[in-house]
């Protein structure tokens, strides 16, 4: 069987397990100054800064942080372990408050976090708790909620630990806490959920439909919304599967739309207006009265197929008319 990708928890353990070695560590291991120099020249050791070495390949973000005299933190750590973050460009580095602000060379694009961390981490990376706490302050509200959803969904922190983070944040961030939902499986789902909430629409998340499988949202009881991203919907085979699922949902009386993740993030107002238009256009036809009858009729059809009885496939639709 092909090996599955490491989980966020496994990625976190791997990053935390990186050892940044000091000269004393190397001497204790029996390496003389000459052997250390030779090991660096031969590529067996990497010198990050004076008195800081690593013995194996490490992520570039860790190299940049340690060379700067700091540690990987915030969005960078979360991105490295597979937690959703919206912005991915800059390296986020936690700098010790006592360190001179001009002492070490730092990447021009780095985002520097000064101040004390509240939990113990490693010499090259802050604790996950501190990284999550910093990420709330470092993002827009919607992106922060999506990150928190992802952290909880992957069970990297408990709800109690997230609550403890909010107790340390200024009052203006407290409004975000009730909006967190660990059922969200991706950042686009979080953004879509908040969009639906802003429209005042009723919705359910991660709904399992007979013959269809699990869908991201069922809105107003009849509209299925699937948030399509390249990560999970790329390739013709996946496209075929998606379209067959849409047809199966149609037999149950559901209308399906598939907004792209790039549009959910980059054109939210247009997506919002499109969803609103679909609800207004179809709601009177397949909404409160007709959709339940369509779904009952489709379920009867599914039962008939399983039992070999071809009866009354469209009776529910005709009765609704």
Across the structure, where does each feature detected by a protein language model lie?
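Surface segments flanking catalytic/ligand-binding clefts of nucleic-acid enzymes
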Residues: 152-321
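Short gly/ser-rich loop at a beta-strand->alpha-helix junction or flexible surface loop bordering the NTP-binding
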Residues: 1-169, 176, 280-321
């Amino acid at each position: 069987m092909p090996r599955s990708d490491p989980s966020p928890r496994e990625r976190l353990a791997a990053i935390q397990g990186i050892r940044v070695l000091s000269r004393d560590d190397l001497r204790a291991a029996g390496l003389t100054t000459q052997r250390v120099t030779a090991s660096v020249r031969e590529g067996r050791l990497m010198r990050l800064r004076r008195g800081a070495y690593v013995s194996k390949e490490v992520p570039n973000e860790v190299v940049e942080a340690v060379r700067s005299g700091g540690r990987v933190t915030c969005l960078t750590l979360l991105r490295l372990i597979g937690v959703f973050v919206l912005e991915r460009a800059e390296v986020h580095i936690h700098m010790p408050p006592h360190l001179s602000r001009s002492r070490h060379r730092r990447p021009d694009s780095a985002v520097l976090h000064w101040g004390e961390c509240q939990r113990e981490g490693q010499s090259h990376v802050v604790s996950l708790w501190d990284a999550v706490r910093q990420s709330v302050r470092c993002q827009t509200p919607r992106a922060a909620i999506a990150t928190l959803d992802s952290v909880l969904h992957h069970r990297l922190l408990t709800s109690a630990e997230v609550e403890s983070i909010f107790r340390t944040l200024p009052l203006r961030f407290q409004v975000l806490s009730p909006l967190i939902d660990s059922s969200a499986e991706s950042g686009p789902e979080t953004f879509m959920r908040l969009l639906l909430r802003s429209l005042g629409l009723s919705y359910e998340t991660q709904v399992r439909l007979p013959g269809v499988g699990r869908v991201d949202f069922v809105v107003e009881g009849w509209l299925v919304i699937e948030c399509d991203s390249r990560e999970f919907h790329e390739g013709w085979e996946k496209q075929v599967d998606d379209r067959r699922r849409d047809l199966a949902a149609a037999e149950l009386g559901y209308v399906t739309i598939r907004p792209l993740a790039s549009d959910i993030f980059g054109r939210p107002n247009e997506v919002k207006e499109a969803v609103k238009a679909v609800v207004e256009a179809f709601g009177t036809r397949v909404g409160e009265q007709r959709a339940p009858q369509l779904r009952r009729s489709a379920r009867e059809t599914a039962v008939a197929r399983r039992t070999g009885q071809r009866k009354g496939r469209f009776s529910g639709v005709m009765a609704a008319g």
